[in-house]
């Protein structure tokens, strides 16, 4: 049964199931359509989602679709990776995927009080739900500096963006 005692229904596993051929074909067509529509716009960067908290395998599927589109069309997509910390580390540790990413955006992990807030991907929780569980404090400048510095070191050669409502 895909729900818990509080009656939340979890459908993310179905959504992110790229082993389902029909669903994977629909996703691939959608991704390619978006790439076709925006490829000539130099100010457009592709992102898997604004608040992506899904699993790494779906991001890899998305990047595989981008790579196959680039190979078929000879065009270059500009890609920003906006995921949870564990998913970003997993994806960027694979050279073929890291080569596709132009920018790593930090929105869903950060230091606060020198402790890392980094919810795991694929846990059926939106960013706001993760925050309610942990009740973190707002990061100060030193926390942000540490977060960005570590990302720059972890992802050499990539632009790093940091987003937070407080700054």
Name each model-derived stretch.
Residues 1-92, 96-103, 135, 156:
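Active-site mouth of glycoside hydrolases
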């Amino acid at each position: 049964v895909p729900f818990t005692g509080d009656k939340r229904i979890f459908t993310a596993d179905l959504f992110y199931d790229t082993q389902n051929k029909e669903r994977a074909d629909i996703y691939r067509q959608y991704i390619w359509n978006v790439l076709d529509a925006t490829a000539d716009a130099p100010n457009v960067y592709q992102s898997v989602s604004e608040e992506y908290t899904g699993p790494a395998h779906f991001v890899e599927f998305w990047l595989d679709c981008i790579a196959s589109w680039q190979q078929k069309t000879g065009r270059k997509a500009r890609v920003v990776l906006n995921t949870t910390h564990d998913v970003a580390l997993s994806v960027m540790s694979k050279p073929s995927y890291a080569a596709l990413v132009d920018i790593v955006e930090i929105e869903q992990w950060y230091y606060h009080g020198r402790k890392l807030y980094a919810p795991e991907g694929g846990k059926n929780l939106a960013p706001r739900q993760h925050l309610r569980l942990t009740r973190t404090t707002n990061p100060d400048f030193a926390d942000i500096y540490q977060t960005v510095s570590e990302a720059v070191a972890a992802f050499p050669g990539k632009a790093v963006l940091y987003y937070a409502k407080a700054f």
